Amino acid sequence: MDSHPFAVSFREDNPHAKQRTGVYEQALAFSEQVDTIVETITARFHLKDLLDKSATVVALRIAQAAGETSKAERRRQYRVARRAATDCAAVLDILARRKGVEPGQIAPARQLVMALVSELAHLSSR
């Protein structure tokens, strides 16, 4: 049986594997939160679509980084994930300003995405 519940595996011999697994878990949790948010959006469908796609890109790029053997390519994947997470944060801000979603519903997702941006910035600089 696997030691983790993911189809994506992070090299256990890597000293940063635990952090990378943690950021992947955060990305999946964020994706779940986004799914809940987008289900409630009844207007501004372009923002709904952008938020959903960008949240998906975050998790996908972290997963792609897990499969890379090149340090430079891993960093690039983390940078792309960070940019997508930053896009998500901006869309959440726009939705809040335009009253597209209740602020209380956005707050947990925004907090999680900001933590993701920070972690991904750190991972992309290694």
Model-predicted regions and their roles:
Residues M1-R126:
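Amphipathic alpha-helical assembly/interaction segments
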